[in-house]
């Protein structure tokens, strides 16, 4: 339970960014999923620190010289993303 709370707090900020700031720029990301969606899924599946590290590596790859394409985040076996985009523990 305590591991899910920090994830969902960060995910709440990402959702706010995607709803408020991201529409001002339009769809400019050359990767699928977009960098903010990648960050949201990465933090939900892997935790705040590891998810932030994966997101940082993704942002470094997102530059004018990259080709883009499909780049899915790594998926955890312990957590899942619910229909609202927040992390919850998988029922084993």
From Swiss-Prot:
Keywords assigned: Cell membrane, Membrane
Compartments where located: Cell membrane
Membrane topology: Peripheral membrane protein
Covalent S-S links between cysteines: none
Pfam families in the record: YidD
Top-level taxon of the source organism: Bacteria
One term under GO cellular component: plasma membrane
Entry keyword annotation includes Membrane: yes
Main location: membrane
Function: Could be involved in insertion of integral membrane proteins into the membrane.
Family label: Belongs to the UPF0161 family.
Xref: PANTHER family: MEMBRANE PROTEIN INSERTION EFFICIENCY FACTOR-RELATED
HAMAP family per the UniProt record, alphabetical: UPF0161_YidD
Name this protein carries in UniProt: Putative membrane protein insertion efficiency factor
């Amino acid at each position: 339970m305590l591991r899910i709370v920090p994830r969902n707090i960060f995910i709440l900020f990402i959702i706010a960014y995607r709803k408020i700031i991201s529409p001002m720029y339009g769809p400019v990301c050359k990767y699928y999923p977009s960098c903010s969606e990648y960050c949201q899924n990465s933090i939900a599946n892997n935790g705040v620190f590891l998810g932030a590290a994966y997101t940082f590596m993704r942002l470094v790859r997102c530059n004018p010289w990259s080709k883009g394409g499909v780049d899915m985040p790594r998926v955890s076996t312990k957590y899942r993303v619910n229909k609202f985009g927040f992390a919850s523990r998988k029922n084993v």
